[in-house]
Structures are given as C-alpha cells and as structure tokens.
Regions:
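Acidic, PIN/NYN-like endoribonuclease modules and their adjacent C-terminal/linker elements
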Residues: 1-10, 123, 129-151
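Short, well-structured N-terminal submotif of metal-dependent ribonuclease cores
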Residues: 1-56, 69-79
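Short acidic-hydrophobic, aromatic-tinged amphipathic segments that line or gate anion-handling sites
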Residues: 91-95, 149-151
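Short active-site oxyanion
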Residues: 50-53, 89-91, 130-132
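Active-site neighborhoods of divalent-metal-dependent phosphate/nucleic-acid chemistry enzymes
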Residues: 93-132
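Helix-adjacent hinge/juxtasegments
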Residues: 65-93
Length: 151
C-alpha cells in the first residue's frame, strides 16, 4: 500500500495533529480509509516517516469515542480511548480558557463556512503549538489555512 499522499511538505521532523476523522479511520476496521491510515501509522511507528511529535486534544477524543460507540462497538471505542490516553507517542492537549475564547473569535470570523467548534479548537491549538499538518479526512482545515494529510 502506498502512503505517498501522507508525506510531509518539509524535511525533518514534522509535528502532526490527529483529527477525529483520521483517528476514526485508524480505529474503525470498516472505515473506507482504514487500510491506508493503518499503513501510515505503521510508518510512523517504524520511523520511516518523520511525523513527530503527534498531538490530539480532549475534544477529538470525545468526538472519536462517541462516534466509535455509535458506528463501531463500545469495545472499539474503549480501545481507542485507552490507546490514545495511555500512549507515550501522542501528546494529549487539554483545553484552556484562552483557546476557548479564541474559538469564539474564529467562529465569528468564519461564520459562513459551517466549520465545527471542535475543528476551530484544533486549528487554534495547532497554531499555538506551531503545528501545520493535520491528519484528517475533512476539508475544513484547508479553509483554515492548514496542511491536510493525506493530500
């Protein structure tokens, strides 16, 4: 399976934020993108692609677990929660008041785009952490000026 669509646009270590849609594709065995996302994560684990560090946030974990409970099984949802929270490879970012306020500003600025609160929170967090690449199967991040992986 080719993963060239996942290669970073820069050389060297590239921080990557993990969106709900990317994690859903990885954890749900019947997701359309499951095999390519699994192959991509295998390359991260072996170090053959330079994405590091990996980030996600509590809003993504909430969305992911809720989605997996309804679209997969409670046991898959629990496995995803446990693997993300216990992972030494993924930094779980907890939200704060300043990010929450910044999301309010972003919602107002992009009010005609229908971008979700969670996606705005991801973008605000990514900018704060100087992360440009996001693993997502969601076009909203391009609207927000971020680099979506896979391309």
């Amino acid at each position: 399976m080719t993963t060239t669509r996942f290669e970073p646009l820069q050389d060297g270590p590239t921080p990557l934020f993990l969106d709900t849609s990317g994690l859903f594709a990885y954890f749900h065995p019947r997701a359309d993108e499951h095999e390519e996302t699994k192959a991509f994560f295998d390359r991260i684990v072996t170090g053959s692609t330079p994405y590091r560090p990996l980030y996600t946030n509590t809003y993504v974990v909430d969305e992911l677990v809720t989605l997996l409970q309804s679209k997969a099984t409670p046991s898959i949802a629990w496995e995803a929660f446990e693997r993300i929270v216990e992972s030494g490879a993924i930094e779980l970012v907890y939200e704060n008041e300043s990010r929450f306020d910044a999301v309010g500003d972003a919602l107002e600025r992009y009010d005609d785009h229908g971008i979700s609160f969670t996606d705005h929170m991801i973008a605000v967090t990514m900018r704060e952490l100087n992360v440009d690449h996001v693993l997502a199967y969601d076009g909203d991040f391009e609207t927000l000026g971020l680099t979506v992986v896979p391309r």
